[in-house]
């Protein structure tokens, strides 16, 4: 991995919330030639298929070994750096890992593009909103409006 790619990767893992989401949205827009959304309830629009597109991504990090508490909070922060936790795709069967895709409101889009930023590659998946309820790990109980 050259220095520019490593710097980009490290930046992806450092971005938070809206800025992280914007990078993912721009990437999917460019890859699939989607246009801007028609309203604030989905991220992009597929003019060819006439579908509302939702885009959700997460970084993939090795699972934390301990729950944070008063006695280990500082130590846990020191161990939380990218070098210790970023997971390569080739390691996904060797370690438990954390990735979190939230606020999936099935009724507001037709197709979901969701992706995982590993340390060495990006995995992109596609699912129709009608398939989400049967997706392993999906919960519609986290946020109001997810039903």
Locations of regions flagged by a protein language model:
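Nucleic-acid endonuclease domains
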Residues: 1-51, 56-147
């Amino acid at each position: 991995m050259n220095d520019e790619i490593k710097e980009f990767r490290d930046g992806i893992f450092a971005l938070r919330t809206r800025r992280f989401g914007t990078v993912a949205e721009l990437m999917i827009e460019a890859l699939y030639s989607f246009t801007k959304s028609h309203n604030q309830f989905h991220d992009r629009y597929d003019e060819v298929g006439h579908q509302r597109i939702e885009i959700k991504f997460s970084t993939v990090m090795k699972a934390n070994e301990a729950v944070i508490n008063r006695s280990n909070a500082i130590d846990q922060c020191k161990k939380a750096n990218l070098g210790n936790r970023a997971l390569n795709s080739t390691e996904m069967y060797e370690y438990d890992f954390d990735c979190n895709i939230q606020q999936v409101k099935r009724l507001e889009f037709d197709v979901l593009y969701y992706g995982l930023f590993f340390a060495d590659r990006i995995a992109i998946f596609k699912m129709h909103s009608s398939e989400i309820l049967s997706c392993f790990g999906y919960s519609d109980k986290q946020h109001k409006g997810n039903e």
